Amino acid sequence: MSGTGPGAAAARDRAETPPRLVAVPGGGNGRPAARPARVVVFLGVDDDGRSRVAASLLAHRAKGRVLAVSASPVSVDPDPAVAASLAQLGVDLSRTTSVTPTAALLDKAELVVVMGYDRGDLGQGRRTEDWCIDDPSGKGADAVRCIRDAIDRRAQRLLIRMGVAIPTRPH
């Protein structure tokens, strides 16, 4: 008898609970920030590498001015080397989870960044761009850092193109 028992209840709870997206920092004075109207979706084949890294870095750099979403039909635990590499920049990868790509989500996006995903599934009329970047999952620490830095540079350039100011570091 399917649909009953503790496993079915847990599955229903997961299905009814909205997916957690990249957290939006607070607005100051203890108040939550308003949800940004601008959305960028990073669409990947699975969510253990590129798309989650890109969403995390864009959210980190945007400081709540852009909602960065990692979307993938398959969500897996992130590679520990990838999480460690992001932690070196002060980015907590555990704050970013994947959502299933839906037409409604993609319609809300100002831009859909495709990372190893079949573009044929996207339909027409969406602003998209391809980021051809190696998947960092399963690679050594040095390779992961290089990939992370390449994604970070692209994320920063994207924010500049969107007109979102990026704070500079003092030298």
Predicted ranges, named:
Residues 3, 10-32, 120-171:
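Phosphate-binding/catalytic loops
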Residues 3, 12-101:
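Conserved active-site segments centered on acidic
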Residues 71, 75, 85, 99, ...:
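Flexible domain-boundary/linker segments
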Residues 100-102, 118, 140:
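Helix N-terminus capping/helix-initiation residues
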Residues 106-107:
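A short, aliphatic-rich alpha-helical micro-motif
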Residues 112-113, 128:
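Short, well-ordered beta-strand core segments
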Residues 113-120:
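Short, polar loop motifs at secondary-structure junctions
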